[in-house]
């Protein structure tokens, strides 16, 4: 065989096997991205509308995102509205008395409440609930891109979602 034939066979092998593999792995990442975005939005919206984060909802959320076959770092934050009623203003309406200050409660504190006797973290109207999810493992798509292109590093993530909103109901 001539050199051109060997090159043609090698190129055909790449086009027939590697390119479809890369395309399918990218498609898998797209499906995982959509799943994570949907689950994150549903989790935060449920917490916003009910005013509480329950262990059952949190476990369902974690189960849904891990069903994609990846590992994730989930960060939750609740910015608790702290009404400062000690500082008065001249208007006598309930909405304008004092200043509102927010303090943050993070993932570890929320998980402690979920594992406690109530199995829930209760919010009140006006609190802000947010969740952020990022994959911690390298997907097949990332590995192939690293092999062929050397584009991404080991610390990068391709699947991520964030959602936040204001709580509209008291949890207790």
Each predicted region: which residue ranges?
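A sequence-composition feature that detects small, non-aromatic residues
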Residues: 8-13, 32, 39, 47, ...
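Alpha-helical assembly-interface signal, strongest on the long, hydrophobic N-terminal helix that forms
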Residues: 2-63
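Serine/threonine-rich low-complexity intrinsically disordered regions
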Residues: 2-3, 90, 106, 139
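Short amphipathic secondary-structure patches
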Residues: 46-122
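Extracytoplasmic
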Residues: 124-128
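Glycine-rich, aromatic-bearing surface loops/beta-hairpins
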Residues: 129-172
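Residues in flexible loops and secondary-structure boundaries
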Residues: 5, 9, 82-84, 139
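Low-complexity, flexible helical/coil segments
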Residues: 1-3, 75-77, 165-172
């Amino acid at each position: 065989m001539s050199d051109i034939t060997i090159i043609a066979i090698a190129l055909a092998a790449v086009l027939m096997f590697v390119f479809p593999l890369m395309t399918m792995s990218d498609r898998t990442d797209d499906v995982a991205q959509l799943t994570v975005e949907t689950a994150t939005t549903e989790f935060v919206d449920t917490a916003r509308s009910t005013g509480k984060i329950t262990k059952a909802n949190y476990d369902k959320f974690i189960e849904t995102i891990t069903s994609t076959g990846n590992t994730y770092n989930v960060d939750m934050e609740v910015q608790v509205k702290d009404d400062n009623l000690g500082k008065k203003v001249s208007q006598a309406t309930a909405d304008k008395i004092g200043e509102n200050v927010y303090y943050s409660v993070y993932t570890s504190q929320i998980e402690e409440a979920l594992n406690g006797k109530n199995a829930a973290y209760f919010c009140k109207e006006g609190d802000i609930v947010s969740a952020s999810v990022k994959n911690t493992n390298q997907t097949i798509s990332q590995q192939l891109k690293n092999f062929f292109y050397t584009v991404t590093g080991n610390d990068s993530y391709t699947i991520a979602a964030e959602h936040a909103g204001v709580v509209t109901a008291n949890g207790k």
